[in-house]
């Protein structure tokens, strides 16, 4: 048994069945896709009830798709006629899919789930770490008479797996969250505080997260015509470390550089700030602030007026 388990773990997969990992609603179109690294002449597929192991649907394949490299086989599996609530898997020859659900509640909670990533990426106080990072951001770069002076731009979100921060991505994320709330206010729950820690505060969690973004954007646009579009640069890329233990050296202790919009390429040698547009950055500020002003008009009129 142990030998068989080891051999099965070592076997190289060469065919896969891709499904909607969230699942399918009962009356929705239900499609899976078979892909293989070898040319296969697939005629049919089966849908298996995961609990009983019984076949609940067996169907001939009517649509053969053009495979995309490196695959040599691709088939579209339509099982839309299956409408019974349950957990299933699909089998095609020796290939089988992960289990998936068919139910009208498969998308419940997904809007809130996406906010988990945003809370994880927070700069300043990070609720995942229950600690703070980059609390001395930052010092002005390309600021004319203000060059090298301190400016408070704490907050916002780290952009990716590194700790750089950009208006371009942050303003877009803020706008999208505000837009989602505008269109579907009842889709979001209240399970987290403004700090990102668990708790209820009477506000949808998406509003707390978008407010985190708006507060930071206001710091990055502190006065008319004064816009900053980036914190830190490629000197950040010194390997993995937690944000509250960041040792990247920008020459001013724990402060990081804050790049002012000038319309020109900025930075030295490979430490380039590649954002050269002013109008593009201004537009992103404007869209986030305009949507925020509309959303907060009835929630926090004073904050709405600040954004307008």
Summary of predicted features, one role per range:
Residues 16-104:
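Ligand-binding face of N-terminal immunoglobulin V-set domains in extracellular IgSF glycoproteins
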Residues 63-81, 129-184, 264-271:
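Active-site-adjacent substrate/metal-binding segments within catalytic domains
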Residues 77-80, 158-168, 195-215, 271-280:
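Aromatic- and glycine-enriched glycan-recognition loops and surfaces
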Residues 205-231:
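Carboxylate/His-rich catalytic cores and anion/metal-binding grooves
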